[in-house]
């Protein structure tokens, strides 16, 4: 008996289990992660633009008549594009993740209802209807929060520090090393 347990694959939990449940919508989940990563990259564009605007001002200080207004304007517009890109990419990341989450919830609820139909009637008599309702409503619904919200945020939180290090290395390698 102990030998049988060693040969069985270990049950997946956490992130791996949620991704396994959403495997029918794998394309949407990965697209959501990709768009969340792009949103994280765009979120740094305004800060980078501010850095270059300040740098431009400091190069000409104290003679502000030498200030290149078109360069500052370009960096300002780029900051605006970065903000809009962040909003748009994050919106579509959440849209994709919500479609995947609701599709997964539908499949889980249908599978649960099908499973309940095949259980002997005597089993249903020993359980309260509230227990089955709790499984259907609360437990299955908890998967939605992870797939729809936490997964895109998780990807963005992994990408953001990498982007920050790349930006710091690009500005001055000593910042990136520190």
Predicted regions: what is each one?
Residues 11, 34, 43-50, 82-133, ...:
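Juxtamembrane helix-loop junctions of ABC transporter transmembrane domains
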Residues 24, 28-39, 152-178:
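Transmembrane helices of ABC transporter permease
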Residues 59, 101, 120, 164-172:
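Short helix-capping/hinge motifs at transmembrane helix termini and TM-loop junctions
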Residues 1-12, 52, 63:
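Membrane-proximal cytosolic tails and large cytosolic loops of membrane proteins
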Residues 19, 55, 113-117:
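Solvent-exposed, non-membrane alpha-helical residues enriched in polar/charged side chains
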Residues 29-89, 169-174:
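Transmembrane helix-loop-helix hairpins at lipid-water interfaces of multipass membrane proteins
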Residues 7, 18-25, 65-71, 138-139, ...:
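Helix-boundary and loop/linker segments of multi-pass membrane transporters
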Residues 11-29, 131-132, 136:
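A short amphipathic helical element positioned immediately N-terminal to and/or at the very start
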């Amino acid at each position: 008996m102990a030998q049988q347990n060693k040969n069985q694959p270990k049950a997946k939990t956490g992130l791996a289990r949620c991704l396994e449940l959403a495997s029918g919508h794998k394309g949407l989940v990965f697209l959501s992660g990709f768009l969340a990563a792009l949103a994280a990259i765009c979120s740094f564009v305004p800060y980078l633009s501010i850095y270059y605007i300040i740098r431009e001002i400091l190069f000409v200080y104290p003679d502000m008549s030498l200030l290149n207004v078109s360069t500052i304007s370009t960096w300002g517009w780029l900051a605006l594009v970065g903000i809009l890109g962040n909003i748009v990419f994050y919106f579509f990341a959440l849209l994709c993740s919500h479609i995947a989450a609701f599709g997964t919830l539908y499949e889980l609820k249908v599978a649960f209802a099908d499973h309940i139909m095949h259980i002997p009637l005597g089993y249903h008599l020993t359980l309260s209807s509230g227990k089955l309702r709790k499984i259907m409503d609360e437990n299955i619904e908890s998967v939605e929060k992870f797939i729809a919200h936490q997964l895109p945020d998780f990807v963005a939180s992994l990408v953001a520090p990498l982007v920050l290090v790349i930006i710091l290395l690009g500005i001055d390698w000593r910042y990136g090393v520190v």
